[in-house]
Amino acid sequence: MKKSPTDGFVDIHHHLIYGLDDGAQTWEQTQQMLTRAGENGIRRIIATPHAEPGMRPFPMRELMERIRQAREWCIQQGMQLEILPGCEIFYTPQTVRMLRDGLIPTLAESEFVLVEFLPTVPYRELRSAAKALTAAGYMPIFAHIERYRCLRWPGRVRKLKRDFSVCMQMNADTICRKHSFFSQRWVNAVIQKGYVDFAATDSHNVTSRACRMRACYRELQQRFGEQTAERLCIVNPAEIQ
């Protein structure tokens, strides 16, 4: 069933769980980020602390305990905000094995996995990661695709989607900000062509990297139409559960 804006936004990329990465550092900061998310009309968040397979152990127990703490606080505050577990995986050769062994979580216990790379990642490594993840039965979502320089070459985003069914996530702040001529043209093109599947906040705090989902929705609505705004902020993200 089609979602409407009244159902609320779904944010699949959010660093609100304190003490696990470079996002929220304290319980008070988590509370502030939850409040900001609610003010932005978000009704479901997938918590995505950084995971670095083979480089450091993932704090699964702490993640689940602090998600439970955040859920209880939201109930006490009367906030209708669902919080689900996940992570943002820095792709390494150990990623598939650690996913299979349950050492790092998928998004909301689904087959979707949020994966990031260095901005200078070669295109062949993106293809290799996509191939390995899909062969193992996962649905890769490449996080903040605007950062990867190799994807600025014509046709490369399309080929990844065609060959491996990779989903693409763009940060809300990227959609809201103005860019240089060629960067703006690329951002507009990948959205207009339907290559971007998710808009997400990648929020780390309430100041320099704050949640801007409502502003992102308005920007998409004004520049690309209501259908695109709903698809990126509501409909597609709601399928991950």
Protein language model features and the residues they cover:
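An N-terminally biased module of ancient metal coordination in phosphate/nucleic-acid-related enzymes
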Residues: M1-M79
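Active-site beta-loop-alpha junctions enriched in small/polar residues
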Residues: H15-I17, H50-A51, G86-F90, L118-T120, ...
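Non-catalytic positions within long, well-ordered alpha-helices that form the structural scaffold/packing
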Residues: G38, T134, I191-Q192
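Extended substrate/RNA-proximal surfaces in nucleic-acid metabolism proteins
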Residues: P57-Q169
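Short acidic/histidine-rich active-site segments
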Residues: Y195-C211
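Mid-to-C-terminal alpha-helical segments outside catalytic/metal-binding sites
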Residues: M213, Y217-Q241
